[in-house]
């Protein structure tokens, strides 16, 4: 991307990541957390401010807007949508994010001021080796950064601003969409495709510049519920059935050496246990 866009992208990104939008996979509401509206409402306000049309927030928490086409061929062009999600992953704090901008990265390890025992280095993050000379943004070490997907949010907003205010760029109709709850698998409400009103859509969410991913990850979720028998430990012989012990046995028989995220890549499938909660009487995997 040409350097003239970098200041706006950085300003937007650094500002957006400081808004806590962590999703909650135990919540039945949409969005799953009310605080996602803090960013969704802001984005709607900013889209109105830069002159986008048809700006609205749906009842399932998606922000939608239109950038009208420009030029003599705009009416013949397909409508293209660009999407990004505002939520961040549950289980890792997104509150009090303090973005650190490391100017003109010279290589080596980057310090995280609130976690001096942690270092971000090319040894643990090989992509860093390709970014010498770039400005790098990290968290402070106490929280996540939220680059997934506030990088995408910042890019889509900067793109919208440019298309609306640069008369030299001819383009067809563009739709902008920001969604909640992608991190918990609920980012695309069944009503969204019709509301989007686009012929084709691209999600800005990870990957190297210039790369387009045309397949989607697909997964099924299962909750294993174990009910044990809890008795007084002093009289538990031949009576207690510890639900936590059974949960451990279930995990122990899974194919850990061949079908886990850390042992597979590409299109290989895997089984991922990401949470175990419970006590002697009841456990869930």
Task: List where the protein language model places each region.
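Active-site metal-coordination/substrate-binding segment of hydrolases
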Residues: 73-173, 178
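Structural signal for hydrophobic packing residues in well-ordered secondary-structure cores
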Residues: 17, 21, 47, 51, ...
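Predominant activation on well-ordered alpha-helical scaffold segments within soluble catalytic domains
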Residues: 10, 14, 41-44, 153-161, ...
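Generic structural signal for well-ordered, non-membrane alpha-helical segments
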Residues: 2, 6-9, 32-36, 40, ...
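A non-catalytic alpha/beta surface segment that caps or lines the substrate-entry region
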Residues: 28-77, 81-83, 87
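N-terminal capping segment at the start of a domain
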Residues: 6-34, 138
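Midchain, well-structured core segments that form catalytic/ion-binding scaffolds
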Residues: 128-129, 134-147, 181-285
